[in-house]
Amino acid sequence: MKGEAQPIGRKKHEIRLIGGKNHEIRLIGGLWKRTKLKVLDKPGLRPTPDRVRETLFNWLGHNLTGWKCFDAFAGTGALGFEAASRGAVSATLVEQDAGLVAQLKLLKTQLNAEAVQVQRGDGIALLKAQRDLDLVFLDPPFDAALFDPALRAAVSVVKPTGLVYLEAPKPWADEDLLPYRLKVHRHLKAGVVYAHLLVLLSA
């Protein structure tokens, strides 16, 4: 596979951070399975829990070879790096916070993750410029009014067979998703997080 990286050894798990406290995320499957990555801890940052991420990628299947993925609110980058670990041909990670962007770039370098692109900017605006995506990750700040514009942007750029992953502080039912031409394919609750895998109504 183009851009294929080698699994990293134990000593390479440690990444020098720019500043602030840090914690770890663990990649669950694929090329970098069990790799632990240190990530910068920021106020309001809410990484997708390991259990939720594992369930999501069980839903998706273990092999994402050739998929084009886009994470509009990347945060720690856990979802995008997991997709790249499982063979995605591209995983675009967008984040507005400068410190998190710098950290995502360090992780990309550490993993030699050529399939990963890191961009700083407005995730929704950059999402609108995409075409024919296989998978869009939407995990916006829960206290921001971003769910409506994010869903509208996502549904306009995914393939007819594409998928949208949505994390939210409340469950979204099919009737809530009708204006976006989406429906719930799979869902789960983990603590205060509701995770949804959505498909187009025409799918």
Question: What residue ranges belong to the model's regions?
Answer:
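Class I S-adenosyl-L-methionine-dependent methyltransferase catalytic core
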Residues: M1-A203
